[in-house]
């Protein structure tokens, strides 16, 4: 653990968000001086961070942790949708940090689940959380992020993955037909093919093929709107399938990670239709695991509703080092 304050950052494909962690009360971190920068205006991570530090005044923080939307390979970190690539050792040396670390964005979200407050969560499925049990997190957005979290003594260790790219698994005859239709158009059909913002459109088009209908030129928001207001049966059936696929995958991840500490949902898609989602077949599909249904029966599922979850994860990671 390092003396406060220290810097945390959440770097996406567009925005570079920074905050100063000034203390902690219980599991809740004090986040101050939050700034949102346009990442494309800076040639490097270091330039954006220096800009942020220049606005702080006072003594420069001695530690930082950055969550990025991109892969981390040893010392090298690379953004997926922003032209930034950097050496972690070089960042630490340039700013004279006593400690610097980089986490994958979903790794940071996973670590955050150990510190989120009750009012940061929306219950989707009731259950009993093992406070030291493994956790699983997934989130449909532009893509589908997946990660796990394991307890090691007094520390929490993120388990990054590319779980969004596993093969999608059907549970009904209709889903078999929908997957076949998607394979004809896309070839390989992964979980992300359907369970993401763009995936909602792919699912809609595949279902239209199965139903013998001509799909409209819809965006994800059009599909959710047509389902929510009841004006489009194909949109409603699409959204129902979307929720079912998420339920099956979430249950699979609960088994894969042994997630007795809970399953957490994130991303920008689900909050757009949270009431619909809660009344869908999500819980039913989560729980239908054959001879292992008893294993997932009491695992809770929560949707993360806190805007600064990645900050919390980065702060919690530094706090336990």
UniProtKB/Swiss-Prot annotation:
InterPro entries: ATPase_NBD, Bacterial_glucokinase, Glucokinase. GO terms for molecular function: ATP binding; D-glucose binding; glucokinase activity. Pfam families: Glucokinase. Its EC number is 2.7.1.2. The keyword tRNA-binding does not apply. Its main location: cytoplasm. Keywords: ATP-binding, Cytoplasm, Glycolysis, Kinase, Nucleotide-binding, Transferase. GO terms for cellular component: cytosol. It catalyses: D-glucose + ATP = D-glucose 6-phosphate + ADP + H(+). SUPFAM superfamilies: Actin-like ATPase domain. GO terms for biological process: glycolytic process. ATP binds at residues 9-14. It is found in: Cytoplasm. Belongs to the bacterial glucokinase family. HAMAP family: Glucokinase. This is Glucokinase. The lineage of its organism: Bacteria, Pseudomonadati, Pseudomonadota, Gammaproteobacteria, Cellvibrionales.
């Amino acid at each position: 653990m390092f003396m406060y304050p220290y810097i945390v950052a959440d770097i996406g494909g567009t925005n570079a968000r920074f905050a100063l962690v000034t203390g902690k009360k219980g599991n809740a971190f004090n986040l101050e001086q939050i700034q949102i920068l346009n990442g494309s205006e800076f040639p490097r991570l270091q330039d954006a961070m220096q800009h942020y530090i220049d606005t702080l005044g006072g003594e420069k923080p001695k530690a930082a942790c950055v969550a990025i939307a991109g892969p981390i390979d040893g010392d090298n970190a690379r953004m997926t949708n922003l032209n930034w690539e950097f050496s972690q050792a070089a960042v630490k040396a340039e700013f004279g940090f006593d400690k610097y670390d980089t986490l994958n964005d979903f790794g940071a979200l996973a670590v955050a689940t150990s510190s989120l407050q009750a009012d940061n969560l929306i219950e989707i499925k009731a259950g009993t959380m093992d406070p030291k049990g493994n956790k699983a997190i997934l989130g449909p957005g532009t893509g589908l992020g997946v990660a796990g979290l394991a307890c090691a003594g007094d520390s929490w260790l993120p388990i990054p993955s590319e779980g969004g790219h596993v093969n999608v698994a059907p549970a009904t005859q209709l889903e078999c037909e929908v997957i076949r239709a998607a394979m004809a158009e896309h070839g390989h059909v992964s979980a992300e093919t359907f369970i993401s913002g763009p995936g909602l459109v792919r699912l809609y088009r595949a279902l239209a093929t199965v139903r013998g209908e001509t799909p409209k030129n819809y965006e994800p928001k059009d599909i959710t709107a047509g389902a929510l207001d009841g004006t489009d049966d194909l949109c409603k059936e699409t959204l129902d399938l979307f929720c079912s696929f998420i339920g099956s995958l979430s249950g699979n991840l609960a088994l894969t990670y042994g997630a007795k500490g809970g399953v957490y949902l994130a991303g920008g898609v689900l909050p757009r239709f949270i009431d619909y989602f809660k009344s869908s077949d999500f819980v039913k599909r989560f729980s239908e695991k054959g001879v292992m249904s008893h294993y997932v029966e009491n695992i809770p599922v929560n949707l993360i509703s806190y805007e600064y979850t990645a900050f919390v994860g980065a702060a919690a990671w530094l706090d336990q080092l």
